[in-house]
């Protein structure tokens, strides 16, 4: 599998405070990299740096090319970002919101040529089960439907890499499973990869292929998901018996 995204000694500082320090990893085709760790570990800040949202030191390369060398429109064709919070204040239809994912592929703002945009939007609506809701106002959607709408938007964008910050945050269990299953289906196509911040360790373990375990802005462990998410490593970072706590919770339901 070929390398798609590479981080080398990435550091992010807010004033005198270092939030991410000397973090390196490589993302290859077909991989789903989970960024896990306690609150304040620097996970969301790291993906903001990858998406171009915050300045950083170090090097980020996309298919061997420095990310800083890409124009914003070029980068948007290659990387799709799903933020943790997606607020809406206008009564756009589901289809209109999903169609915004094609903006990066328009030749210019006024004469927006996008030859396969309609087909991409249709596929995204179908994949996320939103075809029947295409004309509904996004202001009328449930939390799960709204999150699927924004996921469909990045699917319509047709990027090579998805960057996701808590993609199932605040959703019921059934919607969490649905969102992660949709992403898993998207990932099966050639030339794709995913990086996501996930707090739910069970979801990270089930769907991830690889992980970076972060602690206080640094990498505590990285590699294949089963090698990283061990009882010993998780306990060292979370400062508690994570597996024991999970077993106790499940035992209460038995």
Model-derived regions: residue spans:
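Catalytic Walker B motif of ABC-type/P-loop ATPase nucleotide-binding domains
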Residues: 162-166
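The feature captures the beta-strand-to-loop junction immediately N-terminal to the Walker
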Residues: 36-38
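Conserved ABC ATPase signature
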Residues: 137-141, 145
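Conserved ABC ATPase "signature" C-loop
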Residues: 216-217, 223
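Conserved ABC ATPase "signature" region
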Residues: 99, 114-133, 139
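Helix-to-loop junction immediately C-terminal to a conserved catalytic motif
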Residues: 51
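Conserved ABC transporter NBD signature motif
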Residues: 58-66, 75
